[in-house]
Amino acid sequence: MLEGLDGKTVFLGGGSYPGTLDYCKNENFAEKNGILTAEGALWLAQNHLERALYRSRVLVCGYGRIGRVLSGLLLAHGADVTVCSRSALSKTQALFTGARHTDFSGLEQPGDYDLVYNTVPHMIFTKRELQALRRDTVLVDLASFPGG
């Protein structure tokens, strides 16, 4: 397809080809995209969770652009949020906002969550962890390849 666009500038998300610009490499775009993704993820929960977000038990895996914003939105709605991340900094940040924290070893026992979000772009859920979730748990995978 790109061969037919000689002399044209092509914007794309993810990838590097001659004559193209990857908008995902623009930090301003990536930050705003994370906000929109988090808002969309919140909408999904509000429309598919069979209860209010208020006092729902929510696990947010990953505390990058999307995870940070999403956790804040969920906390603002009164959800009981647990953030799963690996760095000491993200743990401190999550706890400071009022969320709980677990590391990835905590995924072996996914607990009694009403809602689970994955934003980690690596495979973190095995068949065992997925089978340990309650049948009514809503799982929203927001991760990019190869984790999503």
Which role fits each region the language model picked out?
Residues 73, 85-86, 90, 117-124:
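Active-site rim beta-loop-alpha module in soluble metabolic enzymes
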Residues 1-55:
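Glycine/serine-rich phosphate-binding loop and adjoining beta1-alpha1 elements at the start
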Residues 52-75:
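Glycine-rich adenosine-cofactor-binding loop
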